[in-house]
Amino acid sequence: MNFKYIVAVSFLIASAYARSVQNDEQSLSQRDVLEEESLREIRSIGAKILGGVKTFFKGALKELASTYLQRKRTAEEQHEVMKRLEAVMRDLDSLDHPEEASEREIRGFNQEEIANLFTKKEKRILGPVISKIGGVLGGLLKNLG
């Protein structure tokens, strides 16, 4: 009689443990699904912000280039500015596909061309603007998180 109770209690404990393990697995899979959904939402928000920033930068760069080119410049200076603007536009477009961009950079540029994309004057102008935008985006991301 005593043996029957021990077997019955052991069976109940084993079945309860099996149910708890199964419930744990289900809750973990549900958590994984929720985490994946939240990551997708974060990525979509980031993509929208990045798209807006890219659009802003493209417009600002075009305006800056047109203003810069309207001044009296030599044809060589204008050509150099347009080359730089095209390089920046390619960089902005490559933000969507960083793997392809790195391959293009390796094929299309040498190190000297990359180093000489901007002159000192342009760096003085664009540096503070980019740092301000970075600060604003950092603040937005901090508020979202």
UniProtKB/Swiss-Prot annotation:
InterPro entries: Bombinin. Residues 19-43, 74-124 form a propeptide. Keywords: Amidation, Amphibian defense peptide, Antibiotic, Antimicrobial, Cleavage on pair of basic residues, Cytolysis, Fungicide, Hemolysis, Secreted, Signal. GO terms for cellular component: extracellular region. Residues 1-18 form the signal peptide. Pfam families: Bombinin (PF05298). One of its GO terms (biological process) is defense response to bacterium. Expressed by the skin glands. The modification Leucine amide is found at L144. It is found in: Secreted. Maximin-5 shows antibacterial activity against both Gram-positive and Gram-negative bacteria. The only exception is the resistance of E.coli. Also shows antimicrobial activity against fungi C.albicans, A.flavus and P.uticale. It has little hemolytic activity. It does not possess a significant cytotoxicity against tumor cell lines. It does not possess a significant anti-HIV activity. Belongs to the bombinin family. This is Maximins 5/H4 type 1. It comes from Bombina maxima (Giant fire-bellied toad). The lineage of its organism: Eukaryota, Metazoa, Chordata, Craniata, Vertebrata.
